[in-house]
């Protein structure tokens, strides 16, 4: 049974078999099962159509669905039938967003909101610490909404809700000239990277998902024959400025008998698939139509006005049926066996660039895109193993705690380099009957950066039963309103009730994360969640690729620890094993830098792009002066750019000090720590790799 058939059977109970077929239908490719309603509706929600830039959407619609005509304001119109009655069925494509309002001398962007509309009270906050795209005349440019580093905000009082004045944008530039070279100009639209469509169990989601599904219904109905009279289908512009596009289109039509508009509703307690109401004399209804009112059709949605607004597929079908009815279509050609929706092209993928950083960026991306909340490190451990050179892969061992260890060289004067495999995230603590999943944090993070974003629940290996999913998609449930920045509790929802979740194997202790996709930022920068410590792991791998183990003069231990973010648990276990014999330990981890206009530079100031960093002082250890001088001399002798600084936080190597082991932290400067958009400079990571190699082979 296809997903559409499963969902359209309104009110039917989903058995475990139906749930599993639902999950696997949505994860298989179109070549396996054909495209699903998820696929079609996701594309409609993903359309970029900022106010004034709706052509980005209408170009695609006209290319894939012939028969539309575009007017001077960008409205699309398609007519079916003739005579009376004359009906208009309309839906607006644009949705609220941001535009570049300032480009600073340092290459940062400031924003202005564009248009109006019903958005969530935490709308601005949902963008903080998230991936963005700048829509330029030459295409999309990746960017991030900046956020204060978690490590540098300790012991500060409760923060107020984020507002537009708090939003800064980092595009990987260091000057206005850099911004210009990226093709960014004043007033360019700025959108959330993943506000476009995505799907989870029985739902599609994204910014204004309900209205976008309504637009898909209008476009689908526009391809059908009406039974009597004439129906004019409109996909309009400038909704965010009072439906100016709709008003202009209606003026061009003269007298009509009926106007139906698919739009948002202020009522969030709807019990039916959609609400239908008559609106008397709206400002955008011209007298020339001869009407005093219009009909507004509002789809039922969850989490209205947020970036994770969700509409069920069954409600989407009901909405389409009602649009057809109001359009005068009594015998639609579409079949309920296959998805009925008009198709659109897939959004263009960002091309990987080829330059002197490609190899480093490629390895880093593979590691950073792995999901491994503290205590669930299997995925990142496998990614590290795959990236190791053959000699290290052969020598690699996983201990009983999950640490990955590589030993090489003669058995004397051992030196250890240690990075960690885990990342901050969440674990399930309770599953309510209604499907709401309570979570606890794993590691130090700001829950506000996850609230109102996509959620992924990860099942733990071993995966012996191929009939069960490995991941479930859902949402981090947003508060309906707030006066403080941080939520008191974190909850996720995956589109299923508690019994269905448990039938799929959801239990307390499973990891939950947001989605992520690492990417280049500007000419030399890189952004991802979990650069702490996938960047350290990458530097260690790159150094290992340069090492010839047969030429080593002493024992070299390369280690990747587990559960660092939750108390150095893996490192403590390794300290018990190696502490009595190892002479030096170098922990490879982030130097949380204050190189950001959001931070004070009196502390932790190590600018990005100026080299690797020695963590001379942090919360857990201090570098011995003689060892610090030795490292600086080695770096100078090999022209490795190296900085020294003091920051907050602690690292794996600090636990070895109690055994009498010399410990120094080796780092790269990083911005926006423990957020979804950590940023580094690839030049610094390459300098760190060279430093690790130099120390590994030093006498």
Question: Predicted regions span which residues?
Answer:
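N-terminal hydrophobic/helix-forming segments and targeting peptides
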Residues: 6-18, 23-699
């Amino acid at each position: 049974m296809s997903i559409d058939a499963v969902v359209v059977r309104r009110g039917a109970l989903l058995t475990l078999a139906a749930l599993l077929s639902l999950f696997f239908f949505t994860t298989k490719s179109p070549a396996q099962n054909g495209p699903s309603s998820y696929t079609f509706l996701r594309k409609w929600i993903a359309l970029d159509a900022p106010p004034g830039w709706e052509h980005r959407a209408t170009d695609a619609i006209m290319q894939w669905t012939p028969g539309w005509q575009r007017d001077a304001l960008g409205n699309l119109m398609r007519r079916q039938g003739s005579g009376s009655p004359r009906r208009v069925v309309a839906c607006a494509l644009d949705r609220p967003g941001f535009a570049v309002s300032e480009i600073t001398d340092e290459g940062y962007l400031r924003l202005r909101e564009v248009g109006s509309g019903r958005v969530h009270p935490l709308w601005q906050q949902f963008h903080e610490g998230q991936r963005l795209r700048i829509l330029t005349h030459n295409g999309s440019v990746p960017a991030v909404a900046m956020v204060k580093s978690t490590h540098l905000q300790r012991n500060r009082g409760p923060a107020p809700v984020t507002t537009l004045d708090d939003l800064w944008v980092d595009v990987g530039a260091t000057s206005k000239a850099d911004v210009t070279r990226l093709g960014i100009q004043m007033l360019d639209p700025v959108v959330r990277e993943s506000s476009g469509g995505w799907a989870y169990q029985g739902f599609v989601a994204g910014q204004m998902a309900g209205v976008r599904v309504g637009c898909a219904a209008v476009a689908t109905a526009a391809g059908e024959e009406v039974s009597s009279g004439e129906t004019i289908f409109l996909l309009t512009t400038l909704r965010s400025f009072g439906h100016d596009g709709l008003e202009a289109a209606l003026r061009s039509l003269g007298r009509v008998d009926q106007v139906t508009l698919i739009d948002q509703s202020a009522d969030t307690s709807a019990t039916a698939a959609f609400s239908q109401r008559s609106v008397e004399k709206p400002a955008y209804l011209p007298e020339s139509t001869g009407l005093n009112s219009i009909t507004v059709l509002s789809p039922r949605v969850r989490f209205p006005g947020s970036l994770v607004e969700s509409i069920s597929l069954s409600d989407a079908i009901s909405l389409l049926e009602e649009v057809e009815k109001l359009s005068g279509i009594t015998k639609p050609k579409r079949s309920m066996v296959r998805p009925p929706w008009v198709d659109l092209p897939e959004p263009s993928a960002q091309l990987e660039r080829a330059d002197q950083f490609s190899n480093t960026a490629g390895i880093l991306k593979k590691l950073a895109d792995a999901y491994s909340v503290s205590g669930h490190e299997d995925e990142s451990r496998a990614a590290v193993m795959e990236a190791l050179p053959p000699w290290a892969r052969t020598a690699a061992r996983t201990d009983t705690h999950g640490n990955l260890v590589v030993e090489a060289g003669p058995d004397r004067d051992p030196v250890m380099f240690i990075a960690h495999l885990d990342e901050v995230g969440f674990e399930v603590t309770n599953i309510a009957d209604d499907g709401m999943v309570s979570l606890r944090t794993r590691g130090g993070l700001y829950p506000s950066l996850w609230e109102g974003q996509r959620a992924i629940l990860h099942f733990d290996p071993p995966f012996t039963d191929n009939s069960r999913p490995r991941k479930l998609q859902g949402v981090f449930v947003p508060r309906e309103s707030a006066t403080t920045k941080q939520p008191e509790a974190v909850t996720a929802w995956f589109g299923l009730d508690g019994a269905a979740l448990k039938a799929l194997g959801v239990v307390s202790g499973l990891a939950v994360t947001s989605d992520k996709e690492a990417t280049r930022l500007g000419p030399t920068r890189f952004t991802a969640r979990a650069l702490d410590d996938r960047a350290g792991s990458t530097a260690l791998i790159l150094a290992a690729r340069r090492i010839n183990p047969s030429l080593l003069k002493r024992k070299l231990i390369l280690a990747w620890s587990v559960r660092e973010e939750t108390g150095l648990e893996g490192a403590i276990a390794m300290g018990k094993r190696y502490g009595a014999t190892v002479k030096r330990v170098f922990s490879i981890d982030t130097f949380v830098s204050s190189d950001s206009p959001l931070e004070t530079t009196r502390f932790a100031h190590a600018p990005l792009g100026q080299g690797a960093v020695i963590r001379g002082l942090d919360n857990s250890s201090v570098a011995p002066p003689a060892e610090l001088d030795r490292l600086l001399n080695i770096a100078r002798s090999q022209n490795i750019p190296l900085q020294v600084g003091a920051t907050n936080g602690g690292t794996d190597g600090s636990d070895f000090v109690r055994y009498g082991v010399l410990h120094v932290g080796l780092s790269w400067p990083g911005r926006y720590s423990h957020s979804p958009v950590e940023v580094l400079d690839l030049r610094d990571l390459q300098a760190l790799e060279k430093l690790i190699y130099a120390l590994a082979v030093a006498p």
